[in-house]
């Protein structure tokens, strides 16, 4: 199980990672098991596109509906390609566009009941609601999706693993600590989207009020670069071929600091490291 024709590096100016071109468009009849594109990642909006070729979903929709549609189109995609939206938790940077996309394109929204109660005053009526239970695998066509609990200051936040034909993607952002459950679910992934929110020194010495710094550092806050490095040290395995660092703070982190710190846990000959950013889409990564 390995990524194919994937560029190393995010294309971010000043970030010292090798780059290679990525020009092949999305294929409806794929030669891969899963494809992923992070449309946006950060405190101003999060959305991730995942597709098996026959089934395509959004995990969170934290930008406006118009902006998500624009970013999909920049990759040769459309909301009309989507089969569903998954919601990890109710914070605005994860749900801003959920309601309008669901209504406009008749998309079901998969969400747990506690998150639904907290989110729906903001997102309004949707096309269809599909409640999932945390810890129970469910199917969207050929995608097997497993939501698992994470520690964050929301009603019932979750991470996800997505499996198709033996290939697994893991998504874990917006978590203050790494629990045994998180490790268990992420240790079998071929591609991992992992939070690296802040550099600890930048956070402590930065402009945030002390109360906000404490919240970010808390057990229900966000993972630091160092915490992400420690997690990868503990869960590395032969199948893990690609890590994408996500939800970087634009105030308390830089892509280069995240790469330099987290990269210490990875063998660059075996695992590709990329960074997702706020202002532009990632490449469309394919995994066989």
Residue map of PLM features:
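Conserved beta-strand hairpin/beta-sheet module of binuclear metal-dependent hydrolase folds
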Residues: 10-75, 158-173, 191
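C-terminal regulatory/interaction regions
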Residues: 2-23, 256-288
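Metallo-beta-lactamase
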Residues: 22, 113-166
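Active-site metal-binding motif and surrounding structural segment of the metallo-beta-lactamase
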Residues: 65-111
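Active-site environment of divalent metal-dependent phosphoester hydrolases
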Residues: 91-95, 117-119, 154-155, 178-180, ...
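Metal-dependent catalytic neighborhoods of phosphoester/phosphodiester hydrolases
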Residues: 96-105, 119-121, 253-260
